[in-house]
Each structure stands twice: as structure tokens, then as C-alpha cells.
Amino acid sequence: MTKYIFVTGGVVSSIGKGIVAASLGRLLKNRGLKVTIQKFDPYINIDPGTMSPYQHGEVYVTDDGAETDLDLGHYERFIDINLNKYSNVTTGKIYSEVLRKERKGEYLGATVQVIPHITDALKEKIKRAASTTDSDVIITEVGGTVGDIESLPFLEALRQMKADVGSENVMYIHTTLLPYLKAAGEMKTKPTQHSVKELRGLGIQPNMLVIRTEEPVEQGIKNKLAQFCDVNSEAVIESRNVEHLYQIPLNLQAQSMDQIVCDHLKLNAPQADMTEWSAMVDKVMNLRKTTKIALVGKYVELPDAYLSVVEALKHSGYANDTAIDLKWVNANDVTVDNAADLLGDADGIIVPGGFGQRGTEGKIQAIRYARENDVPMLGICLGMQLTCVEFARHVLNMEGANSFELEPSTKYPIIDIMRDQIDIEDMGGTLRLGLYPCKLKPGSKAAMAYNNQEVVQRRHRHRYEFNNKFRPEFEAAGFVFSGVSPDNRLVEIVELKEKKFFVAAQYHPELQSRPNRPEELYTAFVTAAIKNSN
């Protein structure tokens, strides 16, 4: 029988529910249990694919092409699993599916209501996520805060699950903030008490509290919360601020969180062996070197827009015993005249993805600086496309060369729209999304990065591609197409072989990086940057 764990939040948003859920998932996985995890987002968008990065942060793409919340990146990195489209559910997605069924007459003339139709659809998503992965345990995080009007149908569905599958198969974990008033010198439990009261008013009694705090919590405070919130005192778990996120699973294990969960759900599983994880954390805490990487992007005011890129760089740093000192460079600020001033102290330059015209000329100048000064450079998605544009302009002398996306009237459309995208008008969910194969050119830097594999599978999110009619001119000038689709139709990786490391990929390698298993192309880039710093 599948076990269901529901993680809710109270008092404030962005309290770290996703990290708590991911950490618990890692502990349960290391007990030998098969775990999956999903995120419920109460916003009305179908998915975050068309949302501004300033609003939402990065869009995380799964193997099967779902555009999802960035928390799924945390889930995959912590638990080391590949999630699917059932792992992210929004209000918009649920309502659109219910309305589509109503239009088809599938409700046989019934009045369609929040209860039971919306709540039933939500419960079906929970069960489908568990069944498609054949999991022993599914953890479901509900975005937002208890008391938000948007989350009411989600919480009602969670309440009903207890009756549907039995109380011994369901556990409710509530995460809250425990504020510390410096002037009074004490922690205040009242916000948590009121949050739990709100949750209980919706019919959900939490079985565990996870309290986010900046200071150590005395047992007396835990006992008080246990008494007023009707949970066992040992089930009041402290989640204190840490230097590195990957410390959190170990901190939760030290408080027997996973054992309490297993006892409640009657899961007979051995103790979690966290030896490898602990060794990784110890290494992360004691890195001996530092390497400066300049990240040239258009959304640098919100680092979450590049969350997976940053994490992938860190992972590759761990493998090289080096901390990554990130220098955030706004692409809008980079010009041919100041590129050396902005980028001259960087050991490596990364140009990640993005959409739209703004910042593209600055990215092109950053790529040009890297090429002309032989600074290790990694381009991702749009960064790969602009790498091709830069080469066309400044090496092949194709004045005005550009991407068709950015300048439809360009004489040299180096990057063109994919053939199967021409007649598509909708923006959402219509890109080339998900896992696709990439055939590597033997002897190339890309092939060497991937240990001379013939083919690698990586996740994509794009609508435009390199225009193949320009391939002969590029190749004649020494531009190497080191990764292509198996049918040789789509360019996946480009590079300049004579440079220390000048490689750009159409796909998003960062989405498959793990703290204990860094993505190979990122590792090759960071390794080259380290050598460049010596």
C-alpha cells in the first residue's frame, strides 16, 4: 500500500517547504524505500512556462517535457530521481482538465463543482504520480500558505485522502516560522499556533511540525508547541538556517524525523545510510580552492532564474575541490568597450538561456570577449545560438547576422525557427521540450567531456535551431558541430577545438546535474576554468 505524506506551510511563504520535503525524500530513499514527490501550485496558470522569470524563477523541465516549478529541481537533486508531468499540478491545469471533460459531456449532465469534481481531479493526480512510478511513498508539497484562498481546494483534497486510503497511510507535516524577537530575547509560538488552528479548521490535524528558525529551539518551546498544536513533542522538528542546503537532511535525521515518519506510517525500513551524503557535505564544507565564474544573463537581479545553472556549477566545483565564486553580470551592461572591465577577472564565462531581444547584444559581446581572449566559455540554449551569431558576425564577416527570433528581416538568419514550429501560435507548452538524444563527434571536446560516449540524452526547451544552410561556411572556418541529433538535422553542440574550452549546447545540461554526480559538460567547463586561473 502506497503511503502519502503531505507538506503544508504556514505563517509566511518561501519558508523552505520544498527543501524539507526533498530532504525527507532523500532520507526515506536511503532507507531503501521507493520515493516520488510532487508539487501543488495554486496559481491559475496552466504551468510556469510562460511566466516571467522575475515572477517565478527558472522553469524546470522534466524528462517527459513538462515545464514545472523550480522546486522540482530541488527534489531531483536531493533525492536523485527523475520526475514526470504528474509531479507538478496547478489550479489552471486542474480546472482546464475538468472543464474539458464537462464540454465533452463526461459528467453526464451533473452540476460541476469544486467538491467533488475539482477535489477528485486533485486526488487522481496524487494517486497517478504514485502509480506511474510504483512508489512506496509519495510526498506532496502544497505551495503557498494555509489561509490563502487559492489553496482551499488543494487542502480539502488532502483532507479527503485520509478517509480514502486510511489514516495509517497518510501523514500531514506542517512547516511554520518560529520568529525570534531580538528586543525581547524570545521566540514567539503564537503565529504557529494560529497557523495550526487555521489548518485544523479545514479538517487537517498535523502529525508533525517543522519549525523554521534562526536560533536553536529549547525543549520548553517544543513542548509548548506540542501541547497547543496537539502533536507529540518529539514530532516538533527544528529546521535551522544552515551554511549549505545539503546539510539539512543530516540535521533532520539527527532529530529522528524519518524514523517518526516510518513509525507513523508503519513502514518497516532499515536506518538510512547517509555515509556517502555525509562525506559529500563534509567535502562541500571544506573546499580548498576558489574559481571565479562570470554568469552573463538578463535576469541576474533574481538569482532563482538561474537556480539549476548555479547548482550545476557548484556540483562541478565540488568534484574539483573548488568553491565557485559567481560574478553576476547584467547582459544589458556589456559592450565591446567595457567587456574586459566586466569580465577580465573571471576564470570562466557562462552564458545561459533566455528569451527575447533584451540583453542579447551584451551576451554576444561577452562571447566575443571569451573567444578572442581564450577564456573558457560555456553557452546554454540561447547562449549557444548567440555563440553562432557572434562567430558569423566577427569571424565570417556576415554583417547583421542574427537569429530569426530576434530580427526576422536579417540577411543572415543563422538561427531559424524549427520547421515543426512554424504554424504554432500558442506560446505555452509548444516548445521542443524534454529528453532528446545527442550524437557526439568523436575526438571533440564535447565527446571527451562525456567520456567518449556516442550518444547522450539531455533535456531541451527551445523553438529555434541552427540554420543548416550555413553549416559549410562555419565548418570551413574551423567551427565544429560536435553534437547533433541522430538524424543529423538539429545542431546540439558547437565548439572551437583550438580554444581552452569554448563549447555551447542547445540543451540544458544543468537539469541533470546532481551534487554527488555532476553533469559532465559543466564539469569540463569548470575544470578548464580552474586551469585558466592557475
From Swiss-Prot:
Domain Glutamine amidotransferase type-1: 292-534
Binding residue positions for Mg(2+): 71, 141
SUPFAM superfamilies xref list: Class I glutamine amidotransferase-like, P-loop containing nucleoside triphosphate hydrolases
Pfam families: CTP_synth_N, GATase
Activity-regulation annotation: Allosterically activated by GTP, when glutamine is the substrate; GTP has no effect on the reaction when ammonia is the substrate. The allosteric effector GTP functions by stabilizing the protein conformation that binds the tetrahedral intermediate(s) formed during glutamine hydrolysis. Inhibited by the product CTP, via allosteric rather than competitive inhibition.
Region forming the signal peptide: none
Binding site for L-glutamine: 54, 354, 382-385, 405, 463
UniProt enzyme class: ligase
Reactions it catalyzes: UTP + L-glutamine + ATP + H2O = CTP + L-glutamate + ADP + phosphate + 2 H(+); L-glutamine + H2O = L-glutamate + NH4(+); UTP + NH4(+) + ATP = CTP + ADP + phosphate + 2 H(+)
One GO location term (cellular component): cytosol
Region (Amidoligase domain): 1-267
Binding site for UTP: 13, 188-193, 224
GO terms, biological process: 'de novo' CTP biosynthetic process; pyrimidine nucleobase biosynthetic process
GO molecular function: ATP binding; CTP synthase activity; glutaminase activity; identical protein binding; metal ion binding
Record-annotated active site: 381 (nucleophile), 508, 510
EC number of the protein: 6.3.4.2
Positions bound to CTP: 13, 148-150, 188-193, 224
Function noted in UniProt: Catalyzes the ATP-dependent amination of UTP to CTP with either L-glutamine or ammonia as the source of nitrogen. Regulates intracellular CTP levels through interactions with the four ribonucleotide triphosphates.
PANTHER family the record matches: CTP SYNTHASE, CTP SYNTHASE-RELATED
Assembly with partners or alone: Homotetramer.
Additional information: CTPSs have evolved a hybrid strategy for distinguishing between UTP and CTP. The overlapping regions of the product feedback inhibitory and substrate sites recognize a common feature in both compounds, the triphosphate moiety. To differentiate isosteric substrate and product pyrimidine rings, an additional pocket far from the expected kinase/ligase catalytic site, specifically recognizes the cytosine and ribose portions of the product inhibitor.
Protein name from the UniProt record: CTP synthase
Species lineage: Bacteria, Bacillati, Bacillota, Bacilli, Lactobacillales
